[in-house]
Amino acid sequence: MNLEKLSKPELLTLFSILEGELEARDLVIEALKAQHRDTFIEERYGKYNISDPLMALQRDFETLKEKNDGEKQPVCTNPLSILKVVMKQCKNMQERMLSQLAAAESRHRKVILDLEEERQRHAQDTAEGDDVTYMLEKERERLTQQLEFEKSQVKKFEKEQKKLSSQLEEERSRHKQLSSMLVLECKKATNKAAEEGQKAGELSLKLEKEKSRVSKLEEELAAERKRGLQTEAQVEKQLSEFDIEREQLRAKLNREENRTKTLKEEMESLKKIVKDLEASHQHSSPNEQLKKPVTVSKGTATEPLMLMSVFCQTESFPAERTHGSNIAKMTNTGLPGPATPAYSYAKTNGHCDPEIQTTRELTAGNNVENQVPPREKSVALAQEKPVENGGCPVGIETPVPMPSPLSSSGSSLSPSSTASSSLTSSPCSSPVLTKRLLGSSASSPGYQSSYQVGINQRFHAARHKFQSQADQDQQASGLQSPPSRDLSPTLIDNSAAKQLARNTVTQVLSRFTSQQGPIKPVSPNSSPFGTDYRNLANTANPRGDTSHSPTPGKVSSPLSPLSPGIKSPTIPRAERGNPPPIPPKKPGLTPSPSATTPLTKTHSQAASLTTAEDLASSCSSNTVVANGKDVELLLPTSS
């Protein structure tokens, strides 16, 4: 610690420490003195009692005796020496006090001299004070004169004040008149203000009414805005659906172009085959060909198909019409047809091509029309069976030359029949739309309104969306079946459902084999869910108008309430591919929840559907014309 450079708080702490040490030392000294005081008094005055005169005399005697002896040392100190010391100190104090007294006397003398000087100075001041009084008298006279002047000035000011007061009185009277006039004007103004207040109240009431009307108009405007947003959302939804339709139509156009190319190649090959057959059968006559036995081939799903074309259900059929016209040309030439080659039906999602099948029925029906009665014709039409997913798609017949050319109605296409066929074969079709479309096709087969076209296109877009979502879910779960069998969205069959389906198939086969009576035609109102409007529409339409759309006896859907039992055709997964991208919508619009909700089926529904699927896939019906008669063959196929 540097003692030369200490701050003030450090010095204070140091001084307090030193002071504490000094106080401690004094306390220690006092304690030691208190301890030795009793011993000191005992040593010095222990022998004598000061209050007893006898003891005092004895003490003095002893002291004198000691002086006389001189040999003995007193035990305690001699009090005479102490008294001498005290006397010396008193003398010193006396001398000191005398010196102080002399100093006080000298100071007193100085004070007296100062007082004398002050007295002389005061005398001089009094002498000078006479002159001051004279000057003060002169000053007083001057001030009196000034006072007189001020008094005269005050009088003048008073006169002026009187004049001003009179003027003020006049001004006051004038102001009173003005104030009375202002009061009258103020009353008038208050009356006007009251009137204006009443007017303002009326205007405020009008304003409230206007505000209420404006609020109502704002509410209406908000409602209109909501309607506008809803319509905008609907328009956006329609635009997205139209974009999806456009992409689908582009894909369909590409598929149609590829299909036309393949059909042209097939047509060229068929022309070559026909030319070869004409060259080989030049020497044979048509009568000999009719007497030859009919060859019936029972095709199963394992046999290779000669002519197989798979396309979407929503596609049009320009290539099929070409193919049908080629068949009509071949039959119109009157040349003999081959006995062994067979025309295989092109499948539309698991169903036979309606145009080729209708052409076959027309060529066979025109030849056998004179031999078969009308009742047998209706029975044969009612006995036509559809080809399901796992069934045999090939129907084989003996081509017979047709004496008369085909009418144009056999290959005509109407948009209403296309819409009705697509709606009736769809799992999402509704009976009301089916009834309307079939009614319109029955009334005017060649015409379809733009509203029905829009409904048809929108329905196909929605169905494509749902099927693509279902296929993506099945691909993600690893449950995808082969494309030759998976032509409709079905659930996976378990072993119990398959066993039950096989049992039902055997029962149905035994029932069909044991049945020998004539088969009655199906009534148009035989649907378990009420009137089957598709049968009514097909009975109302001529046969030529329904050549494009499959008949109700051939194509039906187990999921639709109008015709249960047979699975609806869907788009093949091999040709469908990935769905077109959905265009982005506005951020304020939310997608409809129906587009993202997957279709679910309960276990009982799945069991019933798998039973119907196994029944339809294990049995295939082929109608063969042999010697002018319709032969119905029910053939079990390999599952």
Swiss-Prot record:
InterPro entries found in the cross-reference section = Cortactin-Actin_Reg, Cortactin-binding_p2_N
Any Pfam family hit: CortBP2
Record GO terms (molecular function):
protein phosphatase 2A binding
State its location(s): Cell projection, Lamellipodium; Cytoplasm, Cytoskeleton, Stress fiber
- The coiled-coil segments of this chain are 87-285
Chain positions with Phosphothreonine modification: T570, T590
| Entry-annotated residues carrying Phosphoserine | S284, S285, S481, S488, S523, S527, S560, S563, S568, S592
Identify the keywords attached in UniProt to this record, alphabetized.
Cell projection, Coiled coil, Cytoplasm, Cytoskeleton, Phosphoprotein
GO BP field: negative regulation of transmembrane transport; negative regulation of transporter activity; protein dephosphorylation; protein localization to actin cytoskeleton
The UniProt entry lists the main location of this chain as other
**UniProt feature, compositional bias: Polar residues:** 511-529
Q: Where is this region: Disordered?
A: 387-430, 463-490, 511-609
- What's an example GO cellular component term for this entry? cytoplasm
Which residue ranges have biased composition labelled Low complexity?
Answer: 405-430, 467-477, 587-600
Described by its record, this protein's role is as follows: Regulates lamellipodial actin dynamics in a CTTN-dependent manner. Associates with core striatin-interacting phosphatase and kinase (STRIPAK) complex to form CTTNBP2NL-STRIPAK complexes. STRIPAK complexes have critical roles in protein (de)phosphorylation and are regulators of multiple signaling pathways including Hippo, MAPK, nuclear receptor and cytoskeleton remodeling. Different types of STRIPAK complexes are involved in a variety of biological processes such as cell growth, differentiation, apoptosis, metabolism and immune regulation.
- Quaternary context: Interacts with CTTN/cortactin; this interaction may redistribute CTTN to stress fibers. May form homomers. Associates with the core of STRIPAK complexes composed of PP2A catalytic and scaffolding subunits, the striatins (PP2A regulatory subunits), the striatin-associated proteins MOB4, STRIP1 and STRIP2, PDCD10 and members of the STE20 kinases, such as STK24 and STK26.
Q: What is this protein called?
A: CTTNBP2 N-terminal-like protein
